[in-house]
Amino acid sequence: MFEKKTKIICTIADNRCDEGFIRQLYENGMNVVRINSAHASLEGAQMVVDNVRKVSDRFAILIDTKGPEVRLTQMADAVGFVAHTDEIIEIIDNPAEACRKGRLYTTYPHMAEDVPVGSDILIDDGSVDLSVIGKEEGKLICKVMNEGVIKGHKSVNVPNVHINLPAVTEKDKKFIHWAIKANIDFIAHSFVRSANDLQEIQEILDAENSHLKIISKIENQQGVDNLDDILTYCYGVMVARGDLGVEIPAERIPLVQRDIVKACRARKKPVIIATQMLQSMIENPRPTRAEVTDVANAIFQSADAIMLSGESAYGEYPVEAVKTMTKIAQQTEQTLDVNLDLDLRKVVKPVAVVLARSLVAATQELPVKALVFDTYTGRVGRYISTFRPEVPVYAMCYNDYTMRELSLVFGIKAYPFHKVRDKEEFAAESIKILCNEGKIQKGDLVGFIGGVFGAQVGATYMELKYI
């Protein structure tokens, strides 16, 4: 069976995180576990982490922060109310109050100050559109543009309007400090608007000397506009199509997704496509044809990872959803072409990326069975992956956290590895590991890429040899 290269992220909730369940997901193709802090307590998140590590210490854990989001307060009437077209609804600046019919309150106390007349306020991912037709002190006067049910704690989006919220909330900070102690691998920060939004998180990580990597969730037009700067300060990007599809017109989502993936590829950064990939499988055992095509198109576009949210967190068919993604990936990847395009202006280590490109090019002309590299940082793996080699790629990782970070990179299978004296020992020891697993055998031509064994950091040589 063709081993898939696209990585799969599964959202797991603490009310369904037993060891057996996680093992099933892992054995069917899951590479990364996602915990959504918006719906988790610290105790619940720790339970997920503990059970994940019982299954394996080789795959990564990612935690989402809430970021600068606005929500409705709780509803005075638990069932909410129906907003009818052309009704007038007031949005009042008082986060301590409960919403009721005709009056809404949000978690942000300065809506009236920040939101101008003429704006659209979208409730619950756009289910209800409120047009701002007037404002008074501490109050917005809105007209209901379409009928819908409004319930408490639902999302509030104001497209093309800057809301002056802090980039990192107090709850985010608690989860970040917990993530450092719990040895989490990735922090996916929500609603990243600019590189400045990442700096506060990085300062916390640096103060703790943490290896955690930041994933920027692009969820609004500001994030799209500032993507190039954002990519400088993060490990990778998540295309979070849920809020993004509310903040910008839905018909632009495919184009924005394509452009974000292209930008990440140029910068050699992992990119995740998320939200509603197999949405119907929350309730049905089989996906729609459109969903299958959506997953395949993400892979065609060169996404490193694809993500399940509700499908695995609370859906009726979580294991089937992972199996489905795996099958789509296996089928699609067999048609991918090697892509040797390279722009050296956008890479940190030009020598390493040129070596990686040359080694992948060699697989087009010679019967190379596998590519192998050793790494402290995983950077060479990201470089090799960008060119989409057809042959398997194996990483020998000197740090366990680097091994887990590569769980997010297309086509890389990572192994823990011990320090060696020189490149001959590196080749011999890695061959032994891969032969024992049946990945390669005597007589195979294998490509190696690595660095000098000393102070210089980064790949400095490539080698092809028969084993």
Pin down the residues of each PLM region.
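Non-catalytic helical/linker scaffolds that mediate oligomerization, partner binding
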Residues: 1-467
